[in-house]
């Protein structure tokens, strides 16, 4: 029995979001302010154990607020009928199997099943924050003032909050695979406690009160050890031994107290013997509690393996303390679930942003360890902003939250993985492997730039600074994928709707089956050997590729392919022209006048370029030899790229400039920041 999915309606940015869950670990990813924390919070508010963490009118979604205001501002006499009362709904979709699940698990949900049909394997529990009397709510809202000068939205929410009409209700019903209800039985009403008896949840939030200053006296790790102690089984021999020792200490202390306070107690008895309290005899005893002693008298300390010195808890870094604290919390949860008097069939642990205070290497260690700490019968849901956490997970465990205007959509990456594992195994394998090579940054970026190799990756930050400065205020990611593999990443970019450009090379070759590399020029004897260009721009005459308009280089309005074209060539004084085949010769053509200046003769460390500039001082001569130099097997691309990053006033080829400006414009049109 598992929690298969969660549907959220009307809560903050979650206008209507369905999140499917894995049987084991589910990782929720996305940019900042895409509703990841809200996803955890609404579950905590409806079925968590924190009674002070309730739902309020301020949690209503922007869409519901807008509909309410529009209806109330309507001048129609039927305005009251048009008012849509806001509500918040959390639906827990539980899958069960009558053959495989234990009798105890089936028994826990049996009272709430609304069909005896054995084909039904889904129970939905609807948790709802809604008014008990909609008519009354409508009346107080429509009677409220609607003067534009007032903060009418705040006033309406306050009226709803103070009305006392909104209550949280729980009901369950059976549903079939096609989401139909095949009987007319009413839904079963539940209490929050009855829901928690089916689905037990625990939470570790990002804001843990840990400090690494020497003045920190909170001893929070000691508190974590105390909780772990409380969750250990009553029949654990080690616990009994510890309790016996505490009892022995208690007896010894009581005897000592009796002797120490003997005179004082005798004098008190003497002075009170003639009063109504004279028949009472005072006694001072020790009352020790093991768990309280662990917290109040136990201190976690660290021993340095190299020097054998012992240091207090506060002297260790936040990262190690955070990791230790979280592991202790998980172990305590395990013990609680294992030894709970009322065993629940579904147990879920939520961990919010475990990367807080953990450096990248420790983040990777954490995610590898955490899933192994939980029993296979439990579900674990992690929200994260960390590509290091994500790089350790499989594609099928990922759920990508994306903000579109004022609402969140959830992209189930397992759907993409299942489709491409069948339809395009190469794309699936490429993305799966690249996840561990930091392609995971895609899930946290506002846009992506895919490049051929190290040279492009080194030069792109300077290009952005020069050509598209507004991109610097966004979270862009530059991913090195090579000319061959870019085409396998594009389907994922389109699935998660991430604006992207691919900066690649035209790769001109002879127009025959195994054509050799050739210098580009407008000729029917040439073609492009670049797989990404051929698949996403199209196989066409080389001359047409050189002059293709922008619209035909853009795929599904999301991904633009950028390659060397007509504008990236070099015009000689006689009417002749050389065309660029790679970024390197395109850079030389765009900066031939700069390279010809005396100030750069000693600047370049790339040997072939250095030799060229020492021999030539004419820009035409430099451009004439550019193709042969960058095509030479001894040409050092990375060194040349670094050399170029240090050149003031460097001009980037038009195909790079145009691509970056296009990406800048597309990103600026999208709502990439909002509250969750």
Segments the model singles out, each with a brief description of its role:
Residues 57-87, 91-232, 236-243, 419, ...:
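Glycine-rich phosphate-binding loops of NTPases
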Residues 72-78, 107-113, 177-194, 283-286, ...:
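Short alpha-helical segments and helix-capping/turn motifs at coil-helix boundaries
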Residues 48-79, 334-344, 381, 472-474:
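Flexible phosphate/Mg2+-sensing switch loops adjacent to catalytic phosphate-binding sites
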Residues 403-676:
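Acidic, divalent-metal-binding catalytic cores of TOPRIM
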Residues 206, 210-351, 511:
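Extended helical coiled-coil dimerization/tether regions that scaffold
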Residues 1-48, 301-438, 457-458, 468, ...:
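Switch/communication elements of ASCE P-loop NTPase nucleotide-binding domains
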Residues 4, 200, 347-348, 447, ...:
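The start of beta-strands in P-loop NTPase/AAA+ ATPase cores
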């Amino acid at each position: 029995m598992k929690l298969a999915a969660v549907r959220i309606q009307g809560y903050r940015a979650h206008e209507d979001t369905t999140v499917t869950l894995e049987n084991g670990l589910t990782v929720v990813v996305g940019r900042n302010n895409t509703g990841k924390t809200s996803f955890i919070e609404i579950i905590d508010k409806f079925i968590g154990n924190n009674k002070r963490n309730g739902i309020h009118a301020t949690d209503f979604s922007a869409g519901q607020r807008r509909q309410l205001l529009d209806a109330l501002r309507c001048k129609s006499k039927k305005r009251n009928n048009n008012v849509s009362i806001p509500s918040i709904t959390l639906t827990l979709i539980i899958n069960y199997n009558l053959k495989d699940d234990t009798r105890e698990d089936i028994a826990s949900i049996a009272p709430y099943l609304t069909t005896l049909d054995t084909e039904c394997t889904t129970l939905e529990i609807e948790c709802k924050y809604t008014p008990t009397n909609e008519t009354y709510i409508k009346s107080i809202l429509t009677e409220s003032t609607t003067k534009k000068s007032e903060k009418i939205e705040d006033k309406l929410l306050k009226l709803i909050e103070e009305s006392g009409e909104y209550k949280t209700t729980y009901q369950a019903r059976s549903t079939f695979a096609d989401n139909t209800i095949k009987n007319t039985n009413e839904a079963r009403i539940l209490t929050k406690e009855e829901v928690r008896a089916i689905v037990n949840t625990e939470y570790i939030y990002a804001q843990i009160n840990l400090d690494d200053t020497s003045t920190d006296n909170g001893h929070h790790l000691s508190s974590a050890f105390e909780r772990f102690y409380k969750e250990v089984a009553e029949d654990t021999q080690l616990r009994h031994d510890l309790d016996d020792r505490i009892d022995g200490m208690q007896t010894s202390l009581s005897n000592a107290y009796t002797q120490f306070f003997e005179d004082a107690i005798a004098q008190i008895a003497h002075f009170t013997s003639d009063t109504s309290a004279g028949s009472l005899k005072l006694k001072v005893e020790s009352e020790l509690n093991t768990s309280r002693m662990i917290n109040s008298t136990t201190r976690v300390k660290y021993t340095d393996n190299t020097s054998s010195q012992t240091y207090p808890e506060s002297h260790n870094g936040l990262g190690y303390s955070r990791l230790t604290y979280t592991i202790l919390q998980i172990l305590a949860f395990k013990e609680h679930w294992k030894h709970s008097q009322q065993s629940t069939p579904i147990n879920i642990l939520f961990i919010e942003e475990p990367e807080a205070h953990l450096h990248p290497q420790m983040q990777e260690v954490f995610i590898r360890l955490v899933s192994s700490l939980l029993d296979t019968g439990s579900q674990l849901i992690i929200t994260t902003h960390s590509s290091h956490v994500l790089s350790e997970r499989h594609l099928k465990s990922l759920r990508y939250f994306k903000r579109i205007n004022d609402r969140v959509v959830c992209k189930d990456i397992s759907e993409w993985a299942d489709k491409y594992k069948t339809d395009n195994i190469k794309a699936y394998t490429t993305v799966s492997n690249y996840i561990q090579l930091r392609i995971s940054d895609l899930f946290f970026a506002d846009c992506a730039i895919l490049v051929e190799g190290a040279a492009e990756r080194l030069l792109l930050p300077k290009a952005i600074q020069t050509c598209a400065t507004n991109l610097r205020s966004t979270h862009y990611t530059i991913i090195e994928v090579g000319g061959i593999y870019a085409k396998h990443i594009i389907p994922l970019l389109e699935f998660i709707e991430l604006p992207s450009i691919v900066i690649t090379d035209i790769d001109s070759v002879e127009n025959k089956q195994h054509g050799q590399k050739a210098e580009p020029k407008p000729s029917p004897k040439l073609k492009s050997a670049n797989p990404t260009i051929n698949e996403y721009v199209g196989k066409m005459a080389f001359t047409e590729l050189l002059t293709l308009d922008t619209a035909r280089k853009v795929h599904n309005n999301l991904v633009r392919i950028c390659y060397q074209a007509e504008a990236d060539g070099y015009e000689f004084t006689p009417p002749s022209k050389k065309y660029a085949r790679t970024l390197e010769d395109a850079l030389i053509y765009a900066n031939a006048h700069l390279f010809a200046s005396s100030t750069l003769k000693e600047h370049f460390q790339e040997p072939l370029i250095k030799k060229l500039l020492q021999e030539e001082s004419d820009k035409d001569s430099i451009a004439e030899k550019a193709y042969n130099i960058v095509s030479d097997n001894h040409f050092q691309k990375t060194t040349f790229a670094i050399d170029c990053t240090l050149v003031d006033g460097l001009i980037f080829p038009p195909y790079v400039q145009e691509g970056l400006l296009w990406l800048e414009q597309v990103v600026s049109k999208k709502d990439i920041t909002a509250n969750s």
